[in-house]
Amino acid sequence: MKIKSFLLIILFFIISKIHISFADEAKMTKGFEIFNETAACAACHVLKAAGSEGNIGPNLDTVAGLNYDSVMDIVTHGLGVMPAFGEDEILTKEEIDIVSFYVANSAGK
């Protein structure tokens, strides 16, 4: 009985991991679309994973300390000449979350 319970717990964790990776993959795909089309980040930024070659904003592949929280803050509130996509209601909170996840997991890759 203990072995059966143990195997069920292991199976549950394996299935949970698979579901999480599918969710992350879907989020990355949607993030790519937002980066390249909806928000047009690619027009200004270099990001190898997105195939973008913008030359106005910083190269996101070389920015030190780029993580989800920092990207989320910059996209929401803007920085320098970059618009505040959240404050100006250019993107929804969900879109900002998705594109921030995408950039944080793509930069430097």
Q: Language-model features: where?
A:
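His/Cys-centered metal/cofactor-coordination and adjacent catalytic loops
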Residues: F22, E37, G54
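Gly/Gly-Pro-rich "capping" loops immediately C-terminal to redox-active cysteine motifs
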Residues: A42-T76, V81
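Sequence/structural segment immediately N-terminal to covalent heme-attachment motifs in c-type
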Residues: E25-K48
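N-terminal export/targeting leaders of redox proteins
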Residues: M1-A26, G108-K109
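C-terminal capping alpha-helices of c-type cytochrome domains
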Residues: D88-K109
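Sec-exported extracytoplasmic/periplasmic mature domains
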Residues: N36, A40, G65, T76-G80, ...
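Extended, non-globular alpha-helical segments
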Residues: M1-I3, V75-V81, I90
